[in-house]
């Protein structure tokens, strides 16, 4: 991989991916709306595109070639379709960042638990996919379009809940702040288990997928997982303060991790490619200390 196009990539683990590519000597082009400032300096070429308008991508990519495209900003099968059509004949490998939300709730979900070759996508604009169910349908449909139609090798990465100091969603920070301020955390069931991955591993495996020219779907997560109750317990210990957990969930106190069921991933397939994930306990403890 000598050249790479990143669709998105100016936020969260997308930024880490760009830096890893640059450190490896890859010539990087970043295509975004041009609204978010980045710290890449003169190290990358920048293109301005609108993911929801195929003609803007067709113009931007005209006459260009890249070894690999990393699609970090696709939120509907329509966007997967228009991006691929604008890039057809211009790339050698398509890597799409999907989500563990393609799976139904359950423990140790394997890649085979959702088969995009059997899914029939509906082509709608991203705003037409509402809520968690809509998000799941949109990402499933995007995967389905690429695997069913792309004439180049496709890799799809399905990250667990991504955490890190660079998480602009502040979902993890929400819990740290609530414990620190002794404010209530709303959750109807704090015993369900879920998987995390670090922003370092999310970027690291994406880089690995391009370097090794992987194909197919891969889960990304720490090997271990824990419940919301266990997570809050770790924050309590580090902050030396008791948490206030309530089943009376409001808009203000609702935990972003207040899931209705278990949601954990099996990462055996990813590990078999030679990638080693970080240690969950060490990472979470370190992250809590940094956020307190």
Q: Where do the PLM segments sit?
A:
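Conserved Rossmann-fold NAD(P)-dependent oxidoreductase catalytic core, especially the SDR/UDP-sugar
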Residues: 82-138, 155
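Conserved beta-loop-beta element that borders a ligand/cofactor-binding pocket
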Residues: 143-166
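Alpha-helical substrate-binding/gating segment
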Residues: 176-186, 191-225
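Mid/C-terminal beta-alpha module of Rossmann-like enzyme folds, strongest
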Residues: 205, 209-260
């Amino acid at each position: 991989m000598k050249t790479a196009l990143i669709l998105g990539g100016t936020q969260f683990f997308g930024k880490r991916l760009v830096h890893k590519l640059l450190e490896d000597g890859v010539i990087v082009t970043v295509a975004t709306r041009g609204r978010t400032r980045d710290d890449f300096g003169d190290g990358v070429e920048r293109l301005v595109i609108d993911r929801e308008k195929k003609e803007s991508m067709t113009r931007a990519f005209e006459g260009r070639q890249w070894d690999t495209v990393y699609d970090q900003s696709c939120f509907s099968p329509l966007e997967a379709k228009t991006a691929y059509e604008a890039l057809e004949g211009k790339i050698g490998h398509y890597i799409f960042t999907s989500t563990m939300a393609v799976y139904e709730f359950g423990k140790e979900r394997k890649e085979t638990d959702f088969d995009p070759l059997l899914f029939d996508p509906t082509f709608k604009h991203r705003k037409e996919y509402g809520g968690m169910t809509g998000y799941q349908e949109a990402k499933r449909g995007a995967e389905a379009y690429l695997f069913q139609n792309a004439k180049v090798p496709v890799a799809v990465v399905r990250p667990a809940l991504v955490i890190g100091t660079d998480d602009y969603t502040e979902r993890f920070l929400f819990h740290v702040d609530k414990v620190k301020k002794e404010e209530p955390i709303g959750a109807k069931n704090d015993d369900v288990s879920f998987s995390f991955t670090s922003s370092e591993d999310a970027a690291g495996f994406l880089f690995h997928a391009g370097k090794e020219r992987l194909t197919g779907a891969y889960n990304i997560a720490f090997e271990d997982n824990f419940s919301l109750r266990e997570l809050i317990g770790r924050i309590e210990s580090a902050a030396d303060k008791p948490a206030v957990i309530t089943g009376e969930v409001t808009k203000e106190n609702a935990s972003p991790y207040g899931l209705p069921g278990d949601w954990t991933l099996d990462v055996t397939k990813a590990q078999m490619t030679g990638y080693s994930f970080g240690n969950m306990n060490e990472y979470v403890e370190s992250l809590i200390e940094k956020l307190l």
